[in-house]
């Protein structure tokens, strides 16, 4: 059934969705997933079709039990409107957002472009979201009626565009205060290329007060320790990656999410005219694989197991997942592969990962 659904999706994607504006196509597809999950028996049917995680894939990270190490990266569900639905399609964790303290429309459209030859997406969405207060209300309602199949909920927070850099720490803290009570973990996003000046906050002297303000606000509002991670860009120099890693250890963060999208366009297969037409913004997907893995290796060597590392960027196959886990990641996330491969993708790669682990255990000398 999963293989069939994958073929059907790719046919629909090729003949219909690629003819539609990518943002509209995303809205249609996401609405369809939510609608399917609202049918009374659908969650059970979908879970049987798309999930059934192998017990060998279970992992405990951040004090949380994850049925598998694969989560959906931030950006797909910006406003917490489809967490349970997405869990039905095989993700053990859904990271919502990016959410800002103030609601904002994001950047002008069109702001999402496909580079199909590269299996990549270019976005300059600009943190379009309903704002922390609205998203917190949705999360509170979700927590009040637990789903049949619980999903780990990560919340990714960013700076409101209208807020000056000098006030960034308090802006992040406002989001943390509202959202932390309903989050399994929080991610401070200082690495999107689509909010002017945001990446400047990755500098240690600017990042430190943001992290401290978020931690104090989150733990105070939730009356518990809320695991806190920071998400970094792949475009940081190796020295800057080291500096952020050192800061994360020094400030006793729980982990690092690496990496966000890239502003680089090197090595793309798509025609130059198509790349130029896509314009600026962050590129995700297969071209990010090499740099994302490089950053992971560097972080693992620098932090020596003292932080949880969540690897994101260019993950498409079970082999990619295994490679990231072997390189030091505790969890992995994906987004672009889900867009290109469709609803059966997560279960397929997780099944292949479980089979690979089984073979490794069988081949291990006794």
Curated annotation (Swiss-Prot):
* EC top class named in words: oxidoreductase
BP-aspect Gene Ontology terms = 'de novo' pyrimidine nucleobase biosynthetic process; 'de novo' UMP biosynthetic process
Q: Where in the cell is it found?
A: Cell membrane
Q: Single GO molecular-function term?
A: dihydroorotate dehydrogenase (quinone) activity
Query: Which residues of the sequence carry a binding annotation for substrate?
Result: 78, 123-127, 189, 194, 260-261
List cofactor names only: FMN
Q: Main role? A: Catalyzes the conversion of dihydroorotate to orotate with quinone as electron acceptor.
- Protein known as: Dihydroorotate dehydrogenase (quinone)
